[in-house]
Amino acid sequence: MSALKADGVAFALGGGYALWVAGGPEPSHDVDIVVAESDIEMAANSLAAAGLRVERPPEDWLFKAYCDPDSATEPDEEPALVDVLHRLGGVPVVHSLLDTAREYEVLGVRIPVLPPTPIMIAKLRSLSEHYCDFAALLLVVRAVREQLDWTEIRKATQDNPFAEAFLLLIERLRIIGPL
């Protein structure tokens, strides 16, 4: 992340770690960094120049950056992975979204962190017949529900029946009030 800062690439912490900063459960996997879709190449070049191995998987909404394998602290440990997302829930990331990030100290590093609402929107928009893990979402929503803009979430996810089902579930469980 220091390479992105030094090179002037706008970015923010997203995904599970951003929700953790907001009070959600601690994530157990990779770190998600969000960049504007217009800055993909600049971000990839910045991270590669800093010594990270950049890979472009078949998914068209992210690239992956792996830290130096020697940074692993355990013999069988995989190198640290950073997913660099430029689309959230199918929507291109724009600079105005990154402008909503606030700086926090996360594990000893000052970093911009996206607010919970756009992250939850992306998670709900990603629900489908192939991925529909309500249990993980329930844990997050219970922890950060007061920080979420439910009107904005409902509006942004109204075209996804899986998101609608999740919103109905959390209303019926009285995790949130009626929308």
How would you label these PLM feature ranges?
Residues 1-179:
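Compositionally biased terminal segments of proteins
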